[in-house]
Every structure is written in structure tokens, then in C-alpha cells.
A protein has these predicted regions:
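Secondary-structure capping and domain/repeat boundary segments
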Residues: 129-173
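Acidic, low-complexity intrinsically disordered segments
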Residues: 1-131
Length: 173
């Protein structure tokens, strides 16, 4: 549970799962996506390991992504089996509902960069209130009213929107 004004520290760490010894890192990247209507990046809050580059990127669709990457230009660097890549902070500006900080585009390259190791990440849901507003976008069709639901609950299927010359193919569930 969080409140407007709280600061959330987001950390990216790599942990080798196949062995306990260090390894040679050639390249890695991760995008940690967040909703700028719910979070605000705290300026100058990024702290990273040596050689890690960071960028805050605006994405299509309105989300933002805090991008962290490393590229070795000299045949790789020795890294410990567990390495803290970096942290950054987000200020909660949302006043209701919840939002997910999503781990996307995580890649750890093999030597030569033509493939990558399997990776997993953990998304984090930050909850201000458990009441969420679900909005429907009909792309120029008839209006579909917003619904308020408790976090984790399902919405009630609304009436199908109409748009001249188009037929609704179906709803996602």
C-alpha cells in the first residue's frame, strides 16, 4: 500500500541461476515501464554499477520506460553471480487505484550477441486504493461508460459499442 507523495525505489539486479560463480557479461538491457499519470521519475535518482547507461524514454501509448543497459566493447567483463545493476526512484502521484511497474525487454546476450540467455523479471504493483477505474476506448465508435471495480475483480461486460461500417469482433478477457 502506498500514498500519494511516497517514493518507490526500483532495483534491477541480475542473479545467475545455473551456477554460483561469476561469468563474463557481454551485453544486457532492461526496460522498466511505468505510467506517468501514476508515477513521476525522481530527477537524478538513478544509481548504477560502473558502465551501466540509463535513459528515461517516452513510449507510444503514453507509458514511459526507464532503460538500463550495458555493452562491452572489449570482449566482455567479469561479473559476480549476483550483480546489482542499478536503482531509480519514482514518486507516487496517482491518487487512487493501482499501477504496475513492468519489467520488459530484459535481455542478457551471449558472446557475439546473436542470442540471449533466458531471463525472468518480477513486476511490482503499487496500490494507492483498491478501487480501480476501467476505461474503454471504442476508437470513434459509440461511448462505453467507465466502470469502477475493486482491484483483482472482473468488470461487467458492457454493451458492445457500434461504429458505422464496422462490426465488433469481440472482447478481450
Amino acid at each position: 500500500q502506498a500514498a500519494p507523495g511516497d517514493i518507490v525505489t526500483v532495483a534491477l539486479a541480475l542473479k545467475r541461476t545455473d551456477a554460483d560463480e561469476g561469468y563474463t557479461m557481454y551485453a544486457m538491457q532492461d526496460e522498466l515501464c511505468y505510467d506517468p499519470e501514476f508515477f513521476e521519475l525522481v530527477e537524478n535518482s538513478a544509481m548504477t554499477a560502473a558502465s551501466i547507461e540509463t535513459t528515461d524514454i517516452a513510449l507510444r501509448g503514453g507509458l514511459r520506460s526507464f532503460y538500463m543497459n550495458f555493452v562491452s566493447m572489449g570482449g566482455g567483463e567479469n561479473w559476480d553471480a549476483s550483480t546489482m545493476i542499478g536503482t531509480f526512484q519514482l514518486k507516487v502521484i496517482g491518487t487512487s487505484g493501482s499501477s504496475v511497474i513492468r519489467n520488459t525487454e530484459m535481455q542478457v546476450a551471449v558472446e557475439g550477441g546473436m542470442d540471449s540467455y533466458a531471463t525472468t523479471g518480477r513486476d511490482v504493483t503499487v496500490v494507492v486504493t483498491d478501487e480501480c477505474t476501467v476505461r474503454f476506448e471504442s476508437n470513434g465508435g459509440s461511448s462505453v461508460p467507465d466502470q469502477k471495480v475493486k482491484l483483482g475483480q472482473k468488470v461487467t461486460r458492457p454493451e458492445d459499442p457500434t461504429k458505422e461500417g464496422f462490426a465488433l469482433a469481440g472482447w478481450y478477457s
